[in-house]
Swiss-Prot record:
Pfam families found in the cross-reference section: p450
Transmembrane annotation, as ranges: 13-33
The protein's name: Cytochrome P450 750A1
Keyword annotations of the record: Heme, Iron, Membrane, Metal-binding, Monooxygenase, Oxidoreductase, Transmembrane, Transmembrane helix
PANTHER family according to UniProt: CYTOCHROME P450 98A9, CYTOCHROME P450 FAMILY 1 SUBFAMILY A POLYPEPTIDE 1
Topology with respect to the bilayer: Single-pass membrane protein
Binding-site positions, heme: C465
Record-linked PROSITE patterns: CYTOCHROME_P450 (PS00086)
Cellular localization per UniProt: Membrane
Length: 525
């Protein structure tokens, strides 16, 4: 056979893209093999596919999928999302290693589209990486915005808005004849409370724009983006394609909020100018935006508070305060409706503290022990975030005998930690507030700030939620008002109440909670 004929007999050459893909897969597989054979021992986990890693094993709801994988591979689970090494922690004992022993190493956040495109290139607190900006913003939050004194100064706001909610529920139910949307009543009241704290006034959905989408829609849109595993965040060369449309959605959502926030800031600046010329300006109770604008003007902290920072922090405080508290309240009400004996016990204890004719005050809450137990049990079963916002390792470290590479994304499965039977017993998935009665003497630190990592509804360590005290106060006060004023029932057997979760970052109910109120007190609410 001649050389020319031999060449003709060969198969046609592969196109260049196919060669490049095959080459990438080969080298990626070799790299994965090298990683698995290195001296440092990575945590156990399923083998990743080339390019996509373990994306093919992701199912919704993600916190349940990760719990199932942890049951197979262990409480420190290693995955790879695209090119990003990822560790999932599903036990309180292991969480302590990451969030206390090695807290500083895991104090950062991985870069995400949400922080870049919605929060003005990481000008917020929750999504910003560990560094000078985060430290200064965190300090402002803890020492200026969310102090005990500041929270106390808005006591009248919470009282007024919750009283308005009670009246609204009674009117909407037509004196108990019609089921009311408890979920909507709670979220509306919380939104009003938060806007009055943040900006001294309530806003309607029309204030956000004329497209029919309101603040609740905006919060849901951003929350969906937070909970989505955006392919571009994990496979960088696909980021420009925006395959899931997440970047477009975030930019659009940011534009809507930005126009509203700019107007709100300008109104505050104008109002401040007018107040400065008035004799009684000192009587004015500053809202959060007032405080931030004052810091931007005086710059005594060296934090250099810009308009973008004010907008990012304002939205973050609003969305975190509204969505997380609303979810906890609707799950608490759902569980109490399913367990009438627990509802009755809580109502009796509230009545024993404030009296049948009395009105619940925030100062009464400390004496209502069973209320604390109900809220803690709800947070254990339904943490405000089932999966905590991911951490990122600033350097390589060995944790629990496993090697954790630098820039590893670390996810705390708070939902799994709160339901760990080795900590909470065989009935870990059941709603039993009484389990906390035995712990009340010594207390249980919900923030994980000391040594208690049995449940971490607000995270732990440097990245713990700075607004947890205000959130717990608001949840307890709202729940006490709802139960002291009304008896509640649902259609049909309460034990059969639909308890399905929506597949979202903050795990709300899949369907709104509908219930019938009946006035308990011999007077109109």
């Amino acid at each position: 056979m001649s050389f020319d004929k031999l060449l003709q007999a060969l198969p046609p050459p592969l196109p260049l893209p196919a060669i490049l893909i095959a080459t990438f897969i080969f080298f990626f597989s070799c790299w994965i093999l090298h990683q698995s054979q290195r001296n440092e021992r990575l945590p156990p986990g399923p083998y990743p596919w080339p390019i996509i890693g373990n994306f093919h094993q992701v199912r919704l709801p993600l916190h349940r999928t990760l719990k199932n994988l942890a049951e197979k591979y262990g409480p420190i689970l290693f995955l790879r999302f695209g090119s990003v090494p990822t560790v999932v922690v599903s036990s309180s004992e292991k969480a302590k290693h990451f969030l206390k022993t090695h807290d500083l190493i895991f104090a950062s956040r991985p870069p995400t589209s949400v922080g870049k495109y919605f929060f003005y290139n990481f000008k917020d607190i929750a999504f910003s990486p560990y560094g000078d900006h985060w430290r200064k913003m965190r300090k402002i939050c803890v020492l200026e915005l969310l102090t005990s004194k500041r929270i106390e100064s808005f006591k009248h706001v919470r009282q007024e808005e919750l009283s308005a909610m009670i009246h609204s529920i009674w009117e909407e139910s037509e004196s108990g004849r019609i089921a009311v949307n408890v979920s909507k009543a709670i979220s509306t009241s919380l939104a009003n409370i938060l806007w009055r704290i943040l900006a001294r006034k309530k806003f309607s959905d029309n204030d956000l724009g004329a497209d029919g989408k309101g603040f609740a829609d905006l919060v849901v849109e951003v929350s969906i983006a937070v909970g989505s595993l955006n392919i571009g965040d994990f496979i960088p060369y696909l980021d420009c394609l925006d395959l899931q449309g997440i970047k477009r959605a975030l930019k659009k959502a940011n534009a809507r909020f930005d126009a509203f926030a700019e107007k709100m800031i300008d109104e505050h600046i104008n109002a401040s100018t007018i107040r400065n010329g008035e004799a009684d300006a000192g009587c004015h109770v500053k809202d959060i935006i007032d405080v931030l604008l004052e810091m931007a003007k005086n710059d005594n902290t060296g934090a250099k508070v810009t308009r973008e920072i004010i907008k990012a922090i304002t939205y973050e405080l609003f969305s975190a305060g509204m969505e997380t508290s609303a979810n906890v309240l609707e799950w608490a009400m759902s569980e109490l409706l399913r367990h009438p004996h627990a509802m009755k016990k809580l109502q009796q204890e509230i009545e024993s503290v404030v009296g049948q004719q009395g009105t619940v005050k925030e100062s009464d809450l400390a004496s209502i022990v069973y209320l604390h137990c109900v809220v803690k049990e709800t947070l254990r079963l339904y943490p405000s975030l089932p999966l905590a916002l991911p951490h990122e390792s600033l350097e390589a470290v060995t944790v629990g005998g496993y090697y954790i590479p630098k820039k590893t994304m670390v996810i705390m499965n708070l939902w799994a930690i709160g339901r760990d039977p080795s900590v909470w017993g065989a009935d870990a998935s059941e709603f039993k507030p009484e389990r906390f009665m035995q712990m009340e003497e010594n207390g249980i630190d919900l923030s994980g700030g000391q040594s208690d990592f049995r449940m971490l509804p607000f995270g732990a360590g440097r990245r713990t939620c700075p607004g947890s005290a205000m959130a717990i106060l608001t949840v307890e006060f709202t729940l006490a008002q709802l139960l002291h004023t009304f008896d509640w029932r649902v259609e049909g057997d309460p034990s059969e109440l639909d308890m399905k979760e929506a597949c979202a970052t903050k795990m709300p109910r899949q369907t709104p909670l509908l219930a019938y109120p009946r006035l308990r007190l011999p007077r109109c609410p």
